[in-house]
Each structure stands twice: as C-alpha cells, then as structure tokens.
C-alpha cells in the first residue's frame, strides 16, 4: 500500500464513517506530514512508539565482510544504520 493509497483510504473512511467534509489533498498532506515527522524523529535517533501498532527504532549494524560476486573478492561492508519495527502485542493478536 502506498502513501497515496493510505490517504485515499483515510479520506473514504472520514466521509463514510464520520461525514467529515475534507479534500483529498488535505488528507494526503496530513499523511505526508505524519511520515515526515516519523522520519525526522528516527533521523535524530529517537524511538517512535505508536500505541496499539508498534515501535520503530534505529539500530547500527556493525561492519562485516562480504563478497563481491562479480569480482569474486572479499569486501568490507561498512557500518550502517537500519530501521527496525517491533509490532505491539495488540497488533500481533489482531
């Protein structure tokens, strides 16, 4: 599901379930802003916990040795940061 599809689903539910009068573009902008805030927090090294959904956290992967298949030589894979997601217990149950 893309960001656009998420915004469209939220838009449809707002109109159907809550009779909210809002434009699709406004919903898309809100969804974009939510993702921007999550990204900014993760880039600062902060944990993002969404109750009932899960937690996003940035971890550092240690450098390791890898293989360049084309050249058949061992290469050093540098340290890098990755985003991990741990679903909440409620998320797993549903």
Swiss-Prot record:
Keywords: DNA condensation, DNA-binding. Signal peptide: none annotated. InterPro entries: Hist_DNA-bd, IHF-like_DNA-bd_dom_sf. One of its GO terms (molecular function) is structural constituent of chromatin. One of its GO terms (biological process) is chromosome condensation. Pfam families: Bac_DNA_binding. It comes from the Bacteria. GO terms for cellular component: cytosol. Gene3D superfamilies: IHF-like DNA-binding proteins (4.10.520.10). Histone-like DNA-binding protein which is capable of wrapping DNA to stabilize it, and thus to prevent its denaturation under extreme environmental conditions. Belongs to the bacterial histone-like protein family. This is DNA-binding protein HU. It comes from Aquifex aeolicus (strain VF5).
């Amino acid at each position: 599901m893309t960001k656009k599809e998420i915004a469209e689903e939220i838009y449809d539910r707002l109109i159907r379930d809550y009779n909210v009068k809002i434009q699709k573009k406004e919903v898309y902008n809100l969804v974009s802003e939510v993702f921007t805030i999550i990204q900014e927090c993760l880039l600062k090294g902060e944990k993002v916990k969404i109750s009932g959904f899960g937690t996003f956290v940035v971890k550092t992967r240690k450098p390791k040795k890898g293989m360049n298949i084309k050249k058949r030589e061992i290469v050093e894979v540098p340290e890098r940061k990755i985003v991990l997601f741990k679903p909440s217990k409620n998320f797993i149950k549903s």
